[in-house]
Structures are given as structure tokens and as C-alpha cells.
Amino acid sequence: MGAEVTSQDTQSAQTAPDQAEAGSFALTFGPREAELVRHLYAESRAVLEYGSGGSTVLAVTLGKPVVSVESDKAWADRMSQTLAAHPIASVHYADIGPTKAWGFPDGAEAAGRYHTYPLTVWDRPGLVAPDLVLIDGRFRAACLVATMLRTTEPVTVLFDDYLKRSYYHRVEALATLERMVGRMAVFTVTPGQIPPDMLTETIGWFADPR
């Protein structure tokens, strides 16, 4: 989610993880994408992430409220421990059953819960409405749909690994692709409903963990 968070990114010692803690969670984007993330996180009011790690620590370092969705229970627990002293940050664990590398479902026995990954974070009591959403985890196309359905104002969406993965590109029928920065797409997503002629297709995205 690269370069490590540095002391130049620190806004407040009160909200920032200590140096050793931050250094263990580096941004893993390419240099151009990492610079974009740093800039937009600094400009944001509140951040919602699908996928946690270095970007989550960056948000805390900048003093931004952040909620990160995770499907890997062990990783979610580790991130929760890291963020425990920082009430502006939290991890939203979405139980999609057993997972393997990168939080992909390990088998389909819990497929009936897949929709909880994109959607249930929006039901959290007291959720600070995000104006920036990072999509860098599972069910990526569905996460954009969930954002469109649940946001009440236009939001900026950073969609990682978008460039060469053509199976994501149909989301352009739902949101405005503003620009590409390396492999990352920058969208403006406005509140809306799924067009009737796309309903079958988009519902399928909630079962696609890519």
C-alpha cells in the first residue's frame, strides 16, 4: 500500500504511531501512486479503506479518521493491535470464511457472506462519512458499487491495480474515471443506484473476490 511513512508526514505526536510501529507498515505502492496517496490522504476529511496496512498508518499519522475493511482475521487482529492507541482508526473485520494469501476466500463455503465485505462497513454506528475511499483489497468492483450506493455526497475513490486488470473496467459505466496515476485509477463516485440494465452484472461482482 512504495516508501515508508517518514517524520515529514507526521502531523501530531499525539495521533501518530511511534517510529518503529510506523516503519513496520510501509506503503507498498509504486512511487507515483504512493505520492498520490500521501497527497490525497493529507487533503481528506476521513478515509475508508478496503484493505489495510501502510496506508492506514499514514492516515493515523496525518490525524485522519480511518476505517479499514479486512477479510484476513490474523491480519485484522494485528492491525487492530497496532491501532489500539489511536481512537481515530479502526479495523472492520468482514468474516467471509477461511482465507488464504491476500485475504482471498479459501473455498466457497461462506459465499453467502461475501457481500458483507463491501457493504457492512457502511452500517457501522458513528461512521465518519468518508470523502476518500481506497480500494485495495477484495471484491474491488463491488466495493465501488457499495460506495456509490451508500455515500451521500461525491467521493474520490482510489482504485489500485486498475490499469491492466480489464475485468475491473466495467465500473466506468457507474463512475467517472478522472485520471490514471501509474496502475491506480482515480474516480469520482456520486450517490446513485445501479442502472436496471446492469443489475445482473453488478450483483455478480459481490461474488467475485478479485
List where the protein language model places each region.
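SAM cofactor-binding core of SAM-dependent methyltransferases
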Residues: 31-101
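Short, hinge-like loop/turn segments at secondary-structure boundaries
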Residues: 66-67, 84-87, 108-110, 174-177
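Short, charged, surface-exposed secondary-structure boundary motifs
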Residues: 75-83, 100-104, 166-172, 187-191
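Internal catalytic-core helix/loop-beta-alpha segment
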Residues: 94-146
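C-terminal substrate-binding/active-site "lid" region of AdoMet-derived donor-dependent transferases
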Residues: 123-126, 132-134, 138-210
